[in-house]
Regions:
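Acidic, polar-rich low-complexity tracts and alpha-helical solenoid repeat scaffolds
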Residues: 1-127
Length: 127
């Protein structure tokens, strides 16, 4: 349940704030990372379900949650790629290319040559 995971993260963070030097700090940090990763994975799964239903705008919202809230998880790049795919599947090729360009300019994201190549292939293959 996402609400209970979010509540747990909040409570663990509160513990870390109250007891920064605790011997349990490392375990608490690991638990937060694990819970955030689970929440990101759930949003990715929701996005994939929307894609299957051809509800691309809803899928994009799910992927944006990963990008905006769970940017520090392993799903960050996948979420960006899936937004590009959703735009391409809606024949919004120019928007997909602009999204990639904006991503390249964003200081927080690292767009590798491999990612860019894959994104351009996704745009070409899905539009």
């Amino acid at each position: 349940d996402q609400d209970s995971s979010k509540k747990a993260i909040s409570q663990i963070q509160e513990f870390l704030d109250d007891y920064p030097g605790s011997e349990h700090s490392k375990d608490a940090d690991k638990l937060i990372i694990e819970l955030r990763t689970r929440l990101a994975e759930k949003s990715m799964e929701t996005g994939k379900l929307y894609v299957k239903l051809k509800a691309y705008d809803s899928a994009i919202v799910s992927y944006e949650i990963v990008i905006n809230e769970y940017y520090d998880t392993k799903f960050f790049n996948d979420a960006n790629m899936e937004i590009i795919r959703c735009l391409a599947l809606q024949n919004k090729k120019d928007e997909a290319k602009q999204f990639l360009t904006d991503l390249e300019k964003n200081e927080q994201s690292v767009v590798t040559d491999s990612f860019k190549e894959q994104a351009l292939s996704v745009i070409k293959d899905n539009s």
